[in-house]
Amino acid sequence: MKPLKTLALMLALALTLTACGVISSDDGPTEVVGASQPAEPQETVQPEETAPQPAGKDPIQTEPVRVGALKGPTAMGLVRMMSDDGVNSYTLAGSADELTPKLIKGELDIACVPANLAAVLYNKTEGQIVTLAVNTLGVLYIVENGGEAVQSMADLKGKTLVAAGKGSTPEFGLRYLLEQSGLDPDKDVTVDWKSEHAECVAALAAGTADLALLPQPFVTVAQGKLGNGLRVALDLTAEWDALDNGSAMITGVAVARRDFVEQNPELVDMFLKEYAVSVDWVNENTAKAAELVTANGIIESAAIAEKALPHCNIVCLTGQEMFEKLSGYLQVLAAAAPESVGGALPRDGFFYGV
C-alpha cells in the first residue's frame, strides 16, 4: 500500500475505532515475546498432533507470528500460547486503535479485535483483511449500583449510563436492543461515553454513575470494588437471544492480513490449531489460567480473573461455524446501522476456510 494511502487510512481509522478497555491502565501496548512465564504442567492438556505436512515441508514452526490482542476476553484465550510459546510474539493493548495501525502497516500479522471492526477494516482496506476465528461471544451487561429500577431494556428510558466502546460492538449492540424495545437511542437514553471500561468502573465506585454498560471481566472487577450493592440488571446476550432473529451476539474475532494468510497457509492453520487448544485449556483450568492472565498483565488480580473467566464466553470458532454466527450478526448490524460494518457487508473472501 502506498505511503500516502496508508497514512490516510490510519487517520480514518483513528476516527472510527474505539477502546475495548483495560483493567490496569498502561501508557501503551505491552510487548510479550516468547515465553513470559514458565509453562504450566503439561498433563492437564495434551496438545493435538501436528497435521501431516506436504512433502518437503518442515513441521516445526520457525517463523514467528506477530499477534496483537486487547486486554480482556480477547487476550484471555491466548494466555496458554503466550506462556508456552517461544516463537511467536504478542502485543497487548488497551484499545483497538493501538493495534489496527500496526496490522495495516504489516507490524502485526494477526489481531484480536471487536467483531464489527473486522468488517470495517475489510471495507477500509478494500478486502485486505481476513477473519480467522470468532474468539468471544456475548459478554455485555447493564449493571446497576444500589437499586433495582432496571428490569428490562424499556426501563432504561430516561436513564443515563456510562459506557466505553463507542463505534464498536458495545455501542451498536446497545442501540439495536434499545430500538427493538421501542426506544430511540438518541432521545430516550443518555450514554456518557468513556475511553476505557476501567473509567466506567471508576465512575460507579465514585458514585458519579448508577448505571453502566460493561463487559466481562469488568463486571466482576466492579463487583469486587462495590460488593453486593452492584447487581447485573440485564444480560445483553440474553436480550439479543430473546429476539430470535437468527443471529448471535458476537464480541470479538481474530483477523489477519490477507497477504500474510496467502503466503503462510500452513502457519495460519498451525496457529488456529494451537489457539483452539489454548482456549480449551483456559476454559477447563480457570485457576491456572487466572494466574497466567495476571502474569501477562491482563487483570491485576488472579482471584478476580478466576471468577470472571467462566462468564467471558471465550471460544475459538472457525470455518463454517464461524461463518454462520458472524455473518448473521453482521447482517443484523448492517440492517440497523450500515456504518457499523463499514458501509457494506464483507464478501465471502472475508471468512477464512469457508
Stretches with model-predicted labels:
Residues 80-81, 140-150, 248-266, 318:
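A bilobed periplasmic-binding-protein/Venus flytrap-type ligand-binding module shared by bacterial periplasmic
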Residues 28-38, 42-186, 191-193, 210-216, ...:
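Short, glycine-/small- and polar/acidic-enriched structural segments
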Residues 21-24:
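Bacterial signal peptide processing site
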Residues 1-11:
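Positively charged n-region of N-terminal signal peptides that target proteins for export
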Residues 116-117, 125, 198-292:
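Pocket-lining segment of extracytoplasmic ligand-binding domains
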Residues 261-336:
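Secondary-structure end/capping motifs
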Residues 17-19:
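C-terminal motif of bacterial Sec signal peptides marking the signal peptidase cleavage site
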Residues 327-354:
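Conserved C-terminal helix/tail region of periplasmic/extracytoplasmic solute-binding proteins
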